[in-house]
């Protein structure tokens, strides 16, 4: 007989209570129709001596996991674009999972015309998530992002230069689950003297990333658990998002930030895990 720990016992009990709450009329309405539309703007300052003085004050915006489909419409996407432009980011980063299911989604031709309205003077970058490869979506996603003015980082590096020749580097890895990530081949080029950011959809790859001189890893995939229980945390965590679920973590010299994303998948609810757009302000220190 399998031994059940106290934590697992409590988790099962709380899951049952949460299920009862969500299936009640009030809980169901809140988790399905209210919280999923409460977009939280989280703002953080990134401090490092490696951040050039000329980059001081620059704003980097991360958004993730839209999962366009039944629970996230083009109208929702338009509102997100307006909210992004309202904060005037310098660099915009999308960390994967644009469309929930490419095989069933019928509005694919209209996505780029909305996404391309995102304004960022120092460029827009994107990486693949697992849903972007799934459902034969690989080529569709590439086309949409390029038409939207995003540079797709596929096991590659992009250096952001300013006129004084100062720079930071942004690396992008292919999706770990369904893509062809080349971690060593990509990150071995990271320089110790440069502030290095890596975009990778799945956060739990962070221990491998920490072996390289990467300062910041930005990920999504987890949805912050999408449904959380007080004192016990997330109860819905996908593969490679079980150790690092939301917010900041430190792994050796690496700082990891996991964005909760904006959409929903698998279940139509968000509870205690509001959709998130993150703004990082760079600070030389």
Where are these regions (language model features)?
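C-terminal segment of N-terminal export signals and the immediately downstream linker at the start
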Residues: 23-59, 71-75, 79-82
């Amino acid at each position: 007989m399998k031994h059940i720990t106290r934590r697992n016992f409590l988790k099962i009990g709380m899951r049952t209570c949460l299920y009862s709450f969500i299936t009640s009329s009030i809980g169901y309405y809140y988790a399905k129709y209210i919280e999923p539309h409460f977009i939280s703007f989280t703002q953080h300052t990134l401090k490092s001596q490696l951040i050039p003085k000329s980059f001081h004050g620059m704003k980097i915006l991360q958004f993730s996991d839209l999962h366009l489909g039944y629970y996230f419409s083009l109208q929702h996407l338009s509102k997100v674009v307006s909210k992004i432009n309202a904060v005037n980011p310098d660099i915009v980063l999308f960390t994967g999972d644009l469309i929930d299911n490419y095989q069933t989604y019928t509005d694919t031709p209209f996505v780029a015309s909305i996404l391309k309205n995102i304004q960022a003077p120092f460029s827009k970058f994107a990486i693949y998530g697992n849903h972007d490869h799934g459902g034969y979506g690989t080529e569709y996603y590439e086309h949409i992002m390029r038409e939207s003015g995003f540079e797709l980082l596929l096991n590659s590096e992009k250096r952001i230069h300013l006129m004084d020749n100062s720079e930071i580097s942004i690396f992008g890895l292919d999706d770990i689950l369904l893509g062809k990530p080349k971690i060593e081949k990509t990150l071995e080029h990271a320089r110790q003297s440069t502030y290095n950011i890596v975009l990778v959809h799945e956060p739990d790859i962070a221990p491998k990333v920490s072996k390289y001189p990467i300062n910041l890893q930005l990920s999504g995939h987890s949805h912050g658990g999408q449904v959380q229980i007080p004192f016990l945390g997330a109860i819905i965590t996908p593969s490679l998002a079980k150790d690092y679920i939301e917010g900041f973590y430190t792994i050796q010299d690496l700082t990891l930030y996991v964005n909760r994303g904006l959409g929903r998948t698998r279940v139509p609810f968000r509870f205690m895990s509001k959709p998130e757009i993150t703004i990082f302000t760079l600070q030389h220190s």
